[in-house]
């Protein structure tokens, strides 16, 4: 069995992330570690409570636990594994959609994502459904 050299974990609710963000995260991780070193790079959520991206090498170097308030426990877990975590602050990865406030932040940010297009479509349908002419 061959062990994975590294593992990148991203949640599915970060609609602003782009390929360049992933490349930048990989570059930050490589720069912080050097080839073959054990390393842990994390991108916190905008409120610094959650963990919105983790790049770990080797893949199983640090046990992961996601959910509410996972950022600080992930930092502590890396340190318990004798790895000093690298924190990368990346705004497009930092914004996840967990609450209505997160959704408002997303809608306030300029973007042309599929998520935004779908939300705009839903908003128009809701507006049409609630208009006086639609309710008769």
Where does each model-flagged region fall?
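Phosphate-binding/catalytic loops
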Residues: 54-65, 89-93
